Structure formats: C-alpha cells, structure tokens
C-alpha cells in the first residue's frame, strides 16, 4: 500500500468530521486536509468559479502526492465531482447528498434539508432526491 497521503478539501472545517471518521478507520494512513476558508462559502459561486476552485484545490493536493482525494463538501461534490474524475488520474470520493440517508431513515415520512443553494440546485441532489425521497415530504432551505 502506498504511503502517499489521502487528501481532503472543503470550504471550511465542516469536513473535519469526515476526516476524523476516515482516521478512525484508517489510522495509519497519512492525510492532508485543505480548509479553503478563503473561498468560503462555495454555495454562492458560479459553476465556473467552483470548477476553478475545485481544480486548484485538487492540484494543490496532488502536488503534495495525494493518492486519493475526498471532496468533503456537498456543493463541490454535487457540482464538480464528475469533472474532477475526468480531469485527474486519481480516485475522487464525494459526499452523497444527505437527503438519501434522511429519507431512508425517517420515522415520520418527513425530512428537512439545510444546504447551500448550489447543492439544492444541483442535478445530483435532484437525482438523489427523486430516487430516494420521492415517497417522503421534504422541506428544503438554504443555509445562506
């Protein structure tokens, strides 16, 4: 197994929870976390801006030798993950829109989603919602 690190990026520190979970499963793996607070929040960025930010963050992590990049941000995942996978020759893992686990686990048939406008307006969010939450009532609000 390669000693190269696993890279993470997010628009801030929200993805630290994900980093901790990965660390608990893979404690001996080297990891690099990029908290991109300069460009935060990502939710109000145009698709072009978000692509540029995600490409730049990925290039930074690749320069550090990362063997895998985890996009620890819903907005960047929903808007950019497929473009990142096509552009770079390393695996990318993204964050699945949270409506899926919420819809699968609701006891009341209702779910609430608090996300950026970018996430709520993305094709991936709508596909996931249509596939997994069509039988529940969802209340969606932006966090911005």
Name the predicted role of every residue range.
Residues 1-143:
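Non-catalytic structural scaffold of enzyme domains
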